[in-house]
Amino acid sequence: MPQFNGFKIVPKVQIDDKDVLSLVYTPGVGACCQAIAKNLESAKIYTNKINSVAVVAFDYAAALKRAIFLKSALLIDAYPLVISDETDKNDFKFAIENLEINFCAFDLSLIEDYAKDIDFNVEIPVLKGSVADLKDFFGAISRNVFMLDIKSLKGTVQERSLQLHELSGGAIETELTEEKRNKPVAIVSDGTAVLGFGNIGALASIPVMEGKAALYADFADVDAFPFCVKTQKSEEIVKIVEMFADSFSGIHLEDISAPSCFEVENKLSENLNIPVFHDDQHGTAIIVLAGLLNSLVLTGKEISNIKIVISGAGAAGTAVAKLLHFAGAKNIVMTDINGVVYKGREQNDKYLEELAQITNPSDERGELKDVIKNADVFIGLSKGGILKPEMIKEMEYQPVVFALANPEPEIMPDIAKEAGVYIISTGRSDFENQINNSLAFPGLFKGLLEGKVNKVTDEIKLECALMIASMVEEDELSTDNILPDALDCSVPVQIARVIKEKFGS
């Protein structure tokens, strides 16, 4: 009989080709998000919520022991969560009510005396004391024991993703291990900026978070699970994450809209002694820079001499502009729903005004169609269909277009090529030249954790981008191949290595 000392997160389906990746992650996973947004009860069908239990304790070792027992005895995917015994009970009540969307039950039996007089307003069971037969309490939880043939799924990517998630009951589960492992990473979202759907709520965002967790597990052997919150107030998100921070080895922020995402990341980075990383910002920026560096090799241009137009000044667009500027870009022009971003613009908040200080050096005005003229590079982080063929024809020789809106890019690749684009990339795994964060965040967090690095700096992001770009061999680099394959398992290993070597303690 093995002696279990920990658990790891594992994908329910092995991500071994791009087709499976497109079902577990983008673009297919968006169909699951939309289905849940229309019918919240369907989260029980398309995610692992129905078999996920939170075990709360004052001590991580005690919570872990309980989680191991629940998995070994009842096949329940139990996640240890730790709070301080000095936590205000009203704050704890608020946190539990926000976190219920992730789980089918809370096990508070290890903090029975603390929790017994708290009246939780939740729709799922809360176990406050011991019970004679745990199966009576957890008996309604369904299990998914199956043999799934991916090739048997029929229909579009979206239809097959729905089928896959329904058959597997979500994308992840826990597996007991004999070795001790790092605490997991929390994938935190409020659901305000999910893929290209906008604010569809935290519950509907869970399929994306499970997909991220599956990629962490498969590509980097990093344990992570969804920690989504109902509240959409930045100060409340921070409060909840800080309350449970001792449960985690790192915080991965995902699909939180601007400017809230900046406030949440800044505050958590200041207050916590573990890495905090907003993937929509920095994962995107790293991959865009890597792709741009290799594109410039092909065009023979220098980053300091080109004009870059970025459509979308939200979380991703802001981070991309800042990292490109850090890497040497001198002429970046940003556009958003109000047109070109410039200093002193009436619609600027403090973050856009800060961005205006390092962009638009010629003080251009107007809209996207005005500033795209003579641009060498277009980077779309906005919405589908906004880049028109006639705009491409006004760009410089050998134009580079990164149309990264999901699920519909700013322009479809075939249309872009007909208009004269030299290099076209999208965020989708079903097209060539995918620019996707999945190349960056698994290895980045692996390196941060193994190197005991607690802060993500611009220097780290630049090194990650340089490493990713360098992994496309010179004889393999082409207009249709500017980045390593999304399933290249050597990428996260090399990213982790460079972080540990250059920044590790």
Language-model features and meaning:
Residues M1-S130, E173-I274, K502:
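N-terminal ligand-binding/catalytic initiation module
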Residues Y60-K65, F69, L74, N182, ...:
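Glycine-rich phosphate/diphosphate-binding loop of Rossmann-like nucleotide-binding domains
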Residues D85, P275, D279-D280, T299-K301, ...:
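Adenosine-phosphate binding glycine-rich loop
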Residues L99, V145-T174:
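Amphipathic alpha-helical dimerization/oligomerization modules
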Residues E353-I423, R428-D430:
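Rossmann-like adenosine-cofactor binding region
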